[in-house]
Amino acid sequence: MWKSILAIALGAALGALLRWFLGLKLNSLLSSIPPGTLLANLVGGYVIGAAIAYFAQAPGIAPEWRLLIITGFCGGLTTFSTFSAEVVSLLQEGRLGWAAGAIATHVSGSLLMTLLGLFSMNWMLGK
């Protein structure tokens, strides 16, 4: 149990630090669709897709690795709450087109990156 808790906590801390760094460095570049938040969600989508594919091919790997990467790291990195707050802010400002664009970009981009992660990991593993 303690190994699982430690794996999740470590992964979450690393993911949250990366999300904070991306926001710090990139979000000021474009206020309408902050690129740090978008990149965090896209990278998280790719990583979770690749991890799912990898763990499906490596059933003998310790479960703590899955907890560290998927539950911890991807959970700490991706940010639905920040994305939601940014969209609500755009709506409150009357920027409906930007809000719709942000929703479409985050959702479709994250789904596509998850698929890309799955396919690329399966390709690398020869599956």
Curated annotation (Swiss-Prot):
Positions contributing to Na(+) binding: 75, 78
Compartments reported by the entry: Cell inner membrane
InterPro entries xref list: FluC
Any one Pfam family match given in the protein's UniProt record, by short name: CRCB
Topology of the protein relative to the lipid bilayer: Multi-pass membrane protein
Catalytic activity: fluoride(in) = fluoride(out)
Segments crossing the lipid bilayer: 4-24, 36-56, 68-88, 99-119
The entry's keywords: Cell inner membrane, Cell membrane, Ion channel, Ion transport, Membrane, Metal-binding, Sodium, Transmembrane, Transmembrane helix, Transport
Superkingdom of origin organism: Bacteria
Single GO cellular component term: plasma membrane
GO biological process, alphabetically ordered: cellular detoxification of fluoride
Known regulation of activity: Na(+) is not transported, but it plays an essential structural role and its presence is essential for fluoride channel function.
UniProt-recorded Gene Ontology molecular function terms: fluoride channel activity; metal ion binding
Family per record: Belongs to the fluoride channel Fluc/FEX (TC 1.A.43) family.
Physiological role: Fluoride-specific ion channel. Important for reducing fluoride concentration in the cell, thus reducing its toxicity.
Protein name (Swiss-Prot/TrEMBL): Fluoride-specific ion channel FluC
Organism: Pseudomonas aeruginosa (strain UCBPP-PA14)
